[in-house]
Amino acid sequence: RHAAPHARNIGLRGPLGWPMLLRVARLLILPLMLALAALAALIAGGQIVLTPRWDPFAPFDVAETPGLLTRFKFARTRADGNLCRAALARAGVAFEPVPDRVTGEGCGFSNAGRIGRLSAASLASPVILACPTALALAAYERHHLGPAAASFLNSRVARIEHLGAYACRNINHAATGRRSRHATAEAIDVSGFVLGDGRRLTLTADWSSSDEARAGFLRAARDGACRWFGVTLSPDYNPLHYDHFHLDTGGGRACR
């Protein structure tokens, strides 16, 4: 029941203990940083040619299967209006740029466009979205909605139904408080889906459905949205979201 006299110090002061490991780590950090910087310079200068999938400087491609660099390329593309619009064009998304506007206190949009169709699915009606939000929606449709519909329902998503996108209003339509991300065209409220075979699913009717395929698809749709949107709110969040997914790219983080 009694530990050896020095047992408590083993691993802390031994030749491979934490102090030694920390010293080794400090010695390696600078060479590693220099090596990475040199590698980045060679790639940027064209001396090392990588395939687009492994090139961190290649534009984000909606059609490309997500990999280790997807997050980096997605963030870089979202931050650059020209890259963002080019990525949507390559994906076959009908994104019609609209002039920047200020429509009220804390309301308006920049780098936005009117969008009515994604790569494979249409929107029930065209909406105005900021380009980064449209890009997230396009990637979401390609990599999560389509596969989820095939897996759970043996069909495809033909149309995305929604309750709107841009609107100059506060969060939850409150009379006072912070502006919603809808006020800057950085959010869309998705209320349902129409499949290629004509079936229609809505959050109101199918979120708690006894039909496991329908309910499973909607939960997979919610979980997939969390991969591309900073904030995804579903009926699990609160009663105000009983009939839609709130999807926004305004900078917050939530997946509920």
Show the residue positions of the predicted features:
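A charge-rich, low-complexity, intrinsically flexible signal that marks solvent-exposed coils, linkers
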Residues: 21, 107, 111-113, 242, ...
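Hydrophobic membrane-insertion alpha-helices, especially the h-region
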Residues: 26-47
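Active-site-adjacent substructure of cysteine-protease-like catalytic cores
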Residues: 151-185
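Catalytic cores and adjacent binding grooves of peptidoglycan-active enzymes
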Residues: 27-33, 179-256
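N-terminal Lys/Arg-rich, disordered targeting/topogenic segments
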Residues: 1-24
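Active-site acidic/histidine clusters and adjacent loop/turn architecture
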Residues: 73-160
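Second-shell loop/turn segments in exported
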Residues: 69-75, 127-138, 176-177, 203-212
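Short extracytoplasmic/periplasmic juxtamembrane "stem" segments immediately C-terminal to an N-terminal membrane anchor
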Residues: 54-76
